[in-house]
Every structure is written in C-alpha cells, then in structure tokens.
Amino acid sequence: RLGSEHKLLPVGLASVMTYIDVHGFDFDLYDIDINDYADEKVEKFIKNNKYDIVMYGSIVTHYKWIKWLTKIIKQYHPKTTTIVGNSVSGSIPEIFLRNSSADIAIIGEAELTVLEIILAIYNNNETYETSIIKDISGLAFIDNNGKFIITEGRKGLKKLDDFPMIRWDY
C-alpha cells in the first residue's frame, strides 16, 4: 500500500471493524500504514490518547516494530488491554507474548474472538483479567502464573452471510 495510488483498508481489518461497529462498539481507526506515519507521530498520538483496548496487527515481518508499538502503548497506558492479530502474533503466539508486553494474541479469524473479548471486558466492569478470556476460542495469553495458554481453535467460519457487508468508509 505504501506509495500506492489506491489506498484501501486490508480486508481483514475492515471486516473486524465492521463486525465490532454493527455490534454497537465505538472505535477510532489510526491506520499507521496507509498514512505512512513516522514513529514519533505514532508515539505522540499514543501518549495523548487513552483507550481501554487497543487492537492492532501486522504480518510477521513487522515483529520488531509491533513489539515497539506494544511497548509504547504500555509505557503511556499500562492498564490498556492490547490485542494483537494477524501473523505477527498468530503464527508465533508464545514467542510473541513472551517477548512483548501484549496481553492477547489472536489466532485465526478475528471477528468473533475480538467481539467476545470486548464483551468479556465490558461485562467485567471494563477490567481485563486473564480469567475472563480463558474460555474464548481463538486466542492465546500468558496467565497470572506465567503459563502460556492457547485456547481451542475457533471453528472455521461457514457462512459469510452471518457477517455484515464490509464497510469501507472508516
């Protein structure tokens, strides 16, 4: 996308955003890649904007940068729940979680898993605890005893009609 004439959201990101949106949750999109933001601008944005949950992801080749981003989020907002998806966390979840300060790694398709995480946090007085996500499929985390936990894989999505038409106007 960088340098491309056509700047579009990745399909996966747009699908997750649409799914969260139609279930009544507000969010801000800060698309670092499409806007080619410098690290300093990203850090300033994070410093000046507090969120309960921050979700982000990339391909595994951006591992080092995603670790940096996670560190910056936790540096300014240690209680913010960080959820990381795509292959950067899903392909190497234990390595990623043990070597970053991220809270949750998404494994596989994210729409249902992310919504269930948000609902669990919302229903727990907006407080993240590992105990509230242990039964959610399609994720990994490090529990309070330092044990790596990977939950049951989410069953393949069978009917696209169960999902809303992707919105592209975010």
Regions found by a protein language model. Name each.
Residues 2-13:
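Glycine- and acidic-residue-enriched helix-capping/strand-helix junction motifs
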Residues 12, 19-157:
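Glycine-rich beta-alpha loop elements in corrinoid/cobalamin-binding modules
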Residues 161-170:
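Radical SAM [4Fe-4S] cluster-binding motif and immediate context
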